[in-house]
Each structure stands twice: as C-alpha cells, then as structure tokens.
C-alpha cells in the first residue's frame, strides 16, 4: 500500500522521534521534504539533515534538544491532500503570536511565513511549528 501523505508522515516521525528522545530520524527523501528540512534547520528546530543513498534516497534529520527537552513543542500538518489550504500574502497566519513558524510553499520555493510576508507572497500552508 502506498503512502497517502508523505509530509504528514515526515512530521509524525519528527514528533515521535522527539517524544522517544531519539538523536535522529530517517525517512524516504523527496525535494519537498528536503526543502522543509532546510527551513526547520534555518529556524533552529533541527540540528542538521543529510541525504544518503542513490537509488532510493533516505533523508536523515538530527533532532535538537535544549536542556533535555525537545525544541519542537508542536508540529502540525495544515494543508493535506484531501483539503488544501492556500492563503494570500495578507492572510498568512502568525503561529503562537509570532513565536512559532508556518512553513509555506510559494512560487519562489518553501519558506517561513515571515519570509513570505517580506517577499509579498502567498501560498500553500504546509504546517505549523512551535
């Protein structure tokens, strides 16, 4: 059986990995997952990520902890295959009053809500991270 929502699977692996105090989590790689991982790394929610393998690439995320607690408090899928959520630049949400981020897929690539607002872009809201 094929996976219906690979992005939700990625977010669940991060959530479960941090709940179990894992150092790293692995998952099948894709361009969108790598772009999301890059945003999470830039924002300081994960330590690092790397891609291994040629025929079937595997994405490995190194999870981040601060004083023994997971840095990612909550990670939530918003737009999903059955119900896509798109917002214009003036409708972009602020997660936890600006303390968290919304990961958004725009025409210029995957970025945070802050970067999309500065660039004057809207797009599909992939997930919220706090």
UniProtKB/Swiss-Prot annotation:
Gene3D superfamilies: 3.30.1370.30, 3.30.1490.10. GO terms for cellular component: ribonucleoprotein complex; ribosome. One of its GO terms (biological process) is translation. Keywords: Ribonucleoprotein, Ribosomal protein, RNA-binding, rRNA-binding. GO terms for molecular function: rRNA binding; structural constituent of ribosome. Signal peptide: none annotated. InterPro entries: Ribosomal_uS8, Ribosomal_uS8_CS, Ribosomal_uS8_sf. Pfam families: Ribosomal_S8 (PF00410). PANTHER family: 40S RIBOSOMAL PROTEIN S15A. One of the primary rRNA binding proteins, it binds directly to 16S rRNA central domain where it helps coordinate assembly of the platform of the 30S subunit. Belongs to the universal ribosomal protein uS8 family. Part of the 30S ribosomal subunit. Contacts proteins S5 and S12. This is Small ribosomal subunit protein uS8.
């Amino acid at each position: 059986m094929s996976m219906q929502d690979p992005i939700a699977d990625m977010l669940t692996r991060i959530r479960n990995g941090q709940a179990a105090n894992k150092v790293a989590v692995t998952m099948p790689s894709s361009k969108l997952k790598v772009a999301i991982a890059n945003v999470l790394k830039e924002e300081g929610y994960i330590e690092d990520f790397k891609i291994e393998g040629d025929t079937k690439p595997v994405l490995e995320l190194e999870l981040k902890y601060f004083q023994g607690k997971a840095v990612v408090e909550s990670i939530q899928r918003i737009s999903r295959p059955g119900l896509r959520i798109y917002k214009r630049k003036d409708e972009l949400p602020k997660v936890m009053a600006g303390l968290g981020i919304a990961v958004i897929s725009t025409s210029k690539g995957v970025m945070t809500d802050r970067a999309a607002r500065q660039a004057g872009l809207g797009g599909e809201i992939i997930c919220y991270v706090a």
